[in-house]
Amino acid sequence: MNEIFDLMDEAEEPDEGKVTLCKVIKNADNPLTETSDKTGFFAWKLPAGELIELKGDVRFNDVVFGYVPEKRVLNKISLFAKPGQKIAFVGSTGAGKTTIVNLINRFYDIQSGTITYDGIDVMNIEKDDLRRSLAMVIQDTHLFTGTIADNIRYGKLDATDEEIREAAKIANADSFITRLPRGYDTMLTADGSNLSQGQRQLLAIARAAIAKPPVLILDEATSSIDTRTERLIENGMDAIMEGRTVFVIAHRLSTVRNSNAIMVLEKGEVIERGSHDELLEQKGRYYQLYTGQFELD
């Protein structure tokens, strides 16, 4: 994922006493201890040296943002997501769904309000470290010229072949990969033209699975995918969501019914929020969307 962000991001910001991410040894009865070894556990390291376990508690408080200052795209957005929760964003094109995800990644800085990650203002976290704690499965999956194994390995650069195979199994990608003549050694082109849309999405899920981040962002594919592949994708996503904070940009309401909270956005504001059943009872915009009285575009 870092390679993707390198393409999208500006020059590396200097270290000015900001919070960074470090590997730690985690024991039940002892404080966290920083280590250079591979442990599978990470913590935020404050400038004073204090270690805070990486969990994935994300909060927006009265966030105001515009791509140009005089035109607001988000107006006083407040939300929270705790580890293990799935939050879905629903709304028409231009409502602000993708913008919220961009701010979680800190692709842009907000005009006012606060965004915190495990209680730490994202402005105080090194961008590279912040994004190492996130994984994205987006509509247009980024693939690179190289083998299937290498493309999955972008989620964790030191991953072993065994870890790659296990991640592919979790993502329900192993079955189609092993049917290819060269299996995991199959060469891919940068545009992924030798794979179907569904297969590219399964590889993106495998890449997220191997990264094992506390926060997942899913932008559902809007293009047509056959029913069997769609079921594989949904099952793969369910497998890697467990225990993590998950944000979903929803294009089909059938996939968000089990969300802990659904936020209906319109013109940069949250006009409704609640569970699927709660929103149906309100008989508002979500009810209109679900019953076909109003359509997403």
Go through each PLM region and give its residues.
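ABC-type nucleotide-binding domain
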Residues: 9, 21-297
